[in-house]
């Protein structure tokens, strides 16, 4: 008696990995979810169980990077003892270490690093801003609720712009092991922390010299 073949539905990660492989091998998205599913031996419904479209899959990829970064940080015995600026620095280093392991796919999704479609980063932005707001201490105690809210908004938006500047630097970085990105993170975090909490001049000049040397515009 013939045994009926059991088809195991793919996991979310397996679908994402197959999609990334296809895009990197062909240089473009699959023609359709139906064709992509059939070529990889699973049903179209298996794809839609996790993603409404290829664009949603790509946006989800960046959100999952954030989640994996946070999981890694939370496993560190020292992370929770860090101050806000130290936590943010640790986040950057961990995130871009993970990004390096997926560099080809990330550069592909960001249109070869042109950052033309920031909508792909919208869910990541939401997660990051909530994170920045939770860890960064406001530099000034303001009793006026509206002014205090404005201060918090400015602080988290500045953190997001810093994150984007590091992201752009990393995409363009051609140094071995992307070591210049590590330097940029250190100088950028120090300069921004000094700007918000301390005397900024020396750190800002130091960061400016580094950017000028690398011929990179933040």
Model-assigned labels for residue ranges:
Residues 75-105, 115-116:
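Hydrophobic alpha-helical connector segments
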């Amino acid at each position: 008696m013939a045994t009926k073949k059991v088809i195991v539905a793919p996991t979310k990660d397996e679908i994402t990995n197959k999609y990334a492989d296809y895009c990197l091998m062909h240089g473009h998205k699959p023609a359709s979810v139906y064709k992509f599913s059939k070529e990889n031996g699973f049903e179209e419904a298996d794809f839609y169980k996790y993603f409404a479209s290829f664009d949603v899959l790509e946006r989800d990829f960046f959100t999952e990077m954030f989640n994996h970064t946070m999981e890694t940080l939370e496993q560190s015995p020292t992370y929770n003892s860090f101050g806000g600026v130290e936590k943010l620095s640790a986040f950057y280093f961990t995130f871009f270490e993970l990004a390096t392991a997926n560099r080809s796919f990330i550069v592909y999704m960001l249109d070869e690093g042109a950052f033309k479609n920031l909508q792909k980063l919208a869910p990541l932005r939401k997660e990051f801003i909530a994170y920045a707001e939770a860890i960064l201490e406001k530099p000034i105690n303001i009793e006026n609720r509206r002014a205090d809210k404005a201060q918090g908004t400015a602080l988290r938006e500045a953190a997001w712009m810093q994150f984007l500047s590091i992201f752009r630097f990393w995409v363009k970085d051609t140094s071995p092991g992307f070591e210049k990105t590590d330097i940029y993170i250190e100088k950028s975090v120090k300069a921004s922390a000094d700007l918000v909490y301390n005397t900024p001049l020396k750190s800002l000049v130091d960061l400016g010299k580094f950017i000028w040397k690398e011929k990179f515009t933040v």
